[in-house]
Amino acid sequence: EELAFCGENYGRDRAVLREQSDRAAALMGITHLMDRKLSSLSGGQLQKVALACALASGAPVLLADEPASNLDPAAIADVRRALGVLKEQGLTVVVVEHRLHFLRGLADRVLLMEGGAVKRCWSGEDFYSMGEEKRRSLGLRTLVDPGAPEAWVTSRRGEAGEDSTRVEDARLSCRNLCFSYGDKTVFEGLDADFPAGQITCIAGVNGAGKTTLVRALCGLAAPSGGTISLDGRPASRRQRRAACALVMQDTGRQLFSDTLAGELTIGASDATGEAGEQLLADFDLAHLGDRHPLSLSGGQKQRLVIAAARATRRPVVILDEPTSGVDARHLDSITATLRRIADEGAAVIVVTHDGEFAAACADRLITLTPHSVAH
């Protein structure tokens, strides 16, 4: 119904609507989701549905704003394939992105915007032949595919990690954890440890249960079985909520104050005055302190919520896709901040599909697949 909504408003023939919807679903690899309720889908799956809706509209121009955000590598490949098909069909395709690697060989022109104006323009070939030093000086994300999750931690540490999800002296841990939505099992028998002083990244395909796992860990969702412990002792949902700071995937749902400075004090009353100003400065937000949080860009909202999580000084900090909508400079800033939080003794848990980010910060990587976990 969602894919056909636009065409229905234009009174198109039902047979045409069915054909357009089926074609868009096939292009985006969501045919198996067509009978699912939107409320049951993961953030990445919803992103693919939104793109399929745009494809099914039949419009001659497609504007895609951060289409790769929240998507796993396979889903990004689906997006690339769909954009290529539209290009071959003669449509005008405009993509606004920070994650640039998947558009290599596809983009015909690349425009760099700064301060509301076009600063530079390249042909696709010239842009993707840019040297690494030049790329970084322009504040651009990597132009090279960061590879599969298994390569992320290896590329940072120069060696493979231990093939185990368990460690000694874990700050947060789960044993035989199970979670179901009605008769749908998300995961079962899951064992994992999250040590203090380290950054643990959780990867996996869209719909594998990553967001569900962190919601269960921090006490926002009730697992159907198993035990979750803090510092080696079983902890109730209330205890976990008090110990965890969570940055959700949809940051707009975590903004409540009428100023950025006020946002910091909601969970940390001492984040005022110079302390609050310094925290905003650390995230390049000091010049926006009097702005209403909901007036910020997506990347600015992301950084504000991370700053608010840091202000709480809680022993467990959980972030769900913290680098969506973030450029290279701010990605480096978030990486450095998470490293400081971990060095101060917190267990940092990050759900991410962003290989560039994970390769820069992850000490450990846990890869989820439906109904199982591997390290």
Regions found by a protein language model. Give the residues of each.
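Conserved ABC ATPase "signature" region
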Residues: 16-33, 273-288
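Conserved ABC ATPase signature
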Residues: 37-41, 292-296, 300
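Hydrophobic anchor residue at the start of the ABC signature
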Residues: 51, 306-307
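H-loop/switch region of ABC-family ATPase nucleotide-binding domains
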Residues: 97-98, 352-353
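Helix-to-loop junction immediately C-terminal to a conserved catalytic motif
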Residues: 218
